Regions:
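Gram-positive cell-envelope targeting signals
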Residues: 1-70, 239, 418-426, 433-446
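Serine endopeptidase catalytic core focused on the charge-relay Asp
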Residues: 215-389, 393, 402-403, 411, ...
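Interdomain regulatory linker/hinge segments that flank or connect interaction modules
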Residues: 32-39, 87-131, 309-358
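Signal peptide-directed extracytoplasmic domains
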Residues: 129-156, 163, 203, 207-217
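Conserved PDZ fold ligand-binding element
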Residues: 89, 162-184, 400-403, 407-412
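PDZ-domain C-terminal substructure recognizer with occasional recognition of PDZ-binding tails
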Residues: 110-112, 118-126, 187-226
Length: 446
């Protein structure tokens, strides 16, 4: 009996140990799973940190001559500065220079762990300039480079444009080797073909030069190809500023687009002319207001050479009407100098009467170089709100001043709240002005 009970006790003890071992095994298995999951979370977190660091690094940087360039990265992400011939000038975990004194572009390559290139960063160093804020309503006459296709329609039940590849927004520049500069030239050239196929050279929206052919259709006494075209555009806006050293100027802060295609108009030439303000249509929620004006019987103030997404650029020839002086010149602020809070806009709402009005800079999108919505602004001046309801069409280009410097220009109004809108940085306007090929543009417009 003693032996039996001893055996029973041993058996129970072994069973308890087995249970304990099984429990320990389960706990170890659970612990390993927890460790594995934590490891995965940590790895994903590290990847997320690296992705965020690379993503938030801007693809392009605009800075003023003499400013400090600081681009810091985390461990494992290196920056290489390349020379004009592609040679590596500097490679480090950060690019820190006391001052960048040379105007031009710096090309930086972002590498991961010294081998995998993940991003390019372009640094454009622009000159520090003084400009004369204008804020005057002016007229603009733009003449297209070629004729702009704005629509298509059947001719006698036929579609000569079908399968030609031409789309709305394209520009026709030649027909049968004859240069096309305006709608009259296109009409005459097509009419002279006698119904024979014509070879058309056109420029697509992405600036690719292409050729195609169409067979005109006779309708009445004329031949037509079923394309609606336009060769000019006109409107009223605000002249932002000019550089007193060379009389180069910018207006609008945004580009002029075609009314039918909503695409930026590629111009061959243009004119800045005087405008006569007729009335102010007050803006309200859901319905933007407008400065109503005319450019009839106007005289030329200057020439337009470039229409870009960031404004209309040209040169001034007659400054008397602007009612400004070179003594009014101010520095263009870098975006780093701009602060949220009070600022002023300068605009003309009555003929010959320019005035400053108080606004608020609500938000600054400091890394935004891709469009003309650099700052969110709000009209706070009660007099301006009483006159216009806020920002209205025709005020685009009104210069914005803060702490004695030009910081930008008005570009957009928020439809649901006309007291709010967007503005573009002044340094972007200077950068765009510097990037215009003035020699080529002037030659093309002559």
């Amino acid at each position: 009996m003693m032996t039996f009970f001893h055996f029973k006790d041993n058996l129970k003890e072994n069973y308890n140990k087995l249970e304990e071992n099984v429990e320990n095994f389960k706990q170890n298995k659970i612990s390993k799973k927890i460790i594995l999951k934590l490891s995965i979370v940590i790895v994903l977190l590290i990847i997320f940190i690296y992705v965020c660091n690379i993503s938030f690094m801007p693809e392009s940087i605009i800075m003023m001559q003499g400013e400090t360039l600081n681009i810091n990265t985390i461990l494992g992400i290196n920056l290489e500065q390349q020379g004009s011939n592609g040679e590596i000038l500097e490679a480090s975990s950060s690019i820190n220079k006391n001052k960048v004194n040379e105007v031009g572009k710096l090309d930086l390559k972002v590498n991961l762990f010294g081998s995998l290139q993940v991003k390019d960063v372009s640094v454009n160093v622009i000159p520090k300039v003084k400009v004369v804020p204008v804020g005057k309503a002016i007229g603009m006459k733009l003449y297209t480079d070629g004729v702009l296709v704005v629509g298509m329609s059947e001719i006698e039940g036929k579609k000569p444009y079908e399968n030609s590849g031409i789309e709305e927004g394209d520009r026709i520049i030649e027909i049968d080797d004859s240069k096309i500069s305006n709608t009259d030239e296109l009409i005459n050239t097509v009419n002279n073909c006698g119904g024979q196929p014509v070879n058309i050279t056109y420029v697509s929206e992405d600036e690719e030069v292409l050729t195609t052919s169409m067979t005109p259709v006779k309708t009445g006494e004329d031949y037509k190809i079923g394309l609606w075209v336009r060769d000019a555009a006109a409107g009223v806006g605000t002249l932002t500023f000019y550089n007193p050293e060379n009389n180069k100027c910018v207006a609008l802060g945004h580009g002029i687009t075609d009314i039918d295609t909503s695409k930026l108009i590629n111009i061959a030439s243009g004119e800045l002319v005087s405008a006569n303000i007729l009335s102010i249509e007050k803006g309200e929620k859901g319905k933007p207001g407008e400065i109503k004006g005319t450019i009839e019987n106007s005289y030329t103030i200057g020439k337009v050479y470039k229409n870009t997404a960031f404004g209309v650029y040209g040169t001034l020839e007659n400054k008397q009407i602007l009612n400004v002086s070179e003594n009014d010149a101010v520095e263009v602020a870098s975006r780093e100098e701009i602060k949220t809070g009070k600022a002023e806009i300068l605009c003309e709402l009555e003929n010959g009467k320019k005035q400053k009005y108080e606004i608020e800079i609500e938000r600054i999108f400091i890394n935004n170089n891709s469009d003309n919505k650099s700052m969110l602004i709000k009209i706070t001046d009660t007099e301006l709100i009483e006159k216009t309801g806020g920002i209205i069409q025709g005020m685009s280009g009104a210069p914005i001043l803060q702490n004695g410097k030009l910081i930008g220009a008005v570009t957009h109004v928020l439809v649901n709240d006309p007291t709010e809108g967007y503005a573009v940085f002044g340094d972007i306007l200077v950068e765009q002005m510097s990037s215009v090929d003035w020699v080529k543009s002037i030659a093309n417009s002559s």
